[in-house]
Amino acid sequence: RAFARLGEEGIDLFMADSTNAEVPGFTPTERNIGPVIEDVISRTKGKVVVASFSSHVHRVQQVIDAAAANGRRVALMGRSMVRNMGIASELGYLNVPQGVLIDHKKALKLPDDQIVFMSTGSQGEPMAVLSRIASKTHAIEVGEDDTVILASSLIPGNENSVFRVINALIKLGANVVHKANANVHVSGHAAAGELLYCYNILQPRQVPVSYTHLTLPTN
């Protein structure tokens, strides 16, 4: 309704993201992800490591809720993850049940079936927590009975880095769950249906924003 009112007033410029302009339909809701993460955690006998963007507060909230529902505690791993979630908690955007969050050093002493590690490194960054786990240079060790969830999309250009991490984790014996084999992430970019809807109600003189010339004509 707010967009429609703006359209009635007249829009000269609408900056539109073209990343998913070639994806038909509408981007699925984030609500679909929580039950999938909870199911994966419930079926894991050992430890769970979830890697996502350190700024994705809602994804971390879903992991915390899923861990709590399965009687597990959560340790935040990675400086940016700890910092961002600390700010989110202070501002009231992240709701953590009492006793669920635990210091990472104490988490390492818990039985594997009682802990979820929420980490950075979903894009294969070499010095991030997940890459160090995969290369066996981190205190967290994964193997059989353990599950690693990559709750993110591949950013173009990071394919080789991410696949390298996934292969290393599988080689260690871990079960690796990612967007290609489970519904553990939805895009934050508007698909074709949403873009068309916005253009129809706003009718702007628009200037699309694009990463590549591939998606620009579609938008």
Identify the residue ranges that each predicted region occupies.
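Generic beta-strand/beta-sheet core signal
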Residues: 17, 51, 75-78, 118-120, ...
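Glycine- and other small-residue-rich loops at beta-strand/loop junctions that grip anionic moieties
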Residues: 25-26, 51-53, 184-188, 209-210
